[in-house]
Amino acid sequence: MKKILVVLMAMLTMAVMLTGCGGDSKKAAYPADGDISVIIPKAPGGGTDISARGLIQFMEKELKGSKFVPVNKPDGGGVTGMVELANAKPDGHTLGMVTVELAMFPHQGKCKNTYKDYAAICAPIAA
């Protein structure tokens, strides 16, 4: 029951955030010439994964013609996925989730990436 409540709250949060994302027909179309990878730096079934997959459902409805492919990269406590995301070509074909652990990684010597290495496009879950 608790897990269902968490999923519903995550989906409600995403729905509220996307309400203001209604399109102006004059805006440029998002790249639809290939799959868009969504890097999830956690294992399948966890909170980050469930949130990302819920967000993907909304993005696919909003950006018709674009196919979003979830890619789980849980190795290294999320380091692998977040480093791959930071190093991705900035062409709109790679999106991803960044978790709170990013704030600790440089201090633990796990990686040199900081929040400055990412371009935030939304905050699907915020306290």
Identify the role of each PLM range.
Residues M1-G34:
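Short, low-complexity disordered leader/linker segments with a strong preference
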Residues T19, T99, P124:
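Conserved residues at the C-terminal ends of beta-strands
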Residues S25-Y118:
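N-terminal (or domain-start) structured segment
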Residues I121-A127:
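Short Pro/Gly-enriched coil loops immediately N-terminal to beta-strands
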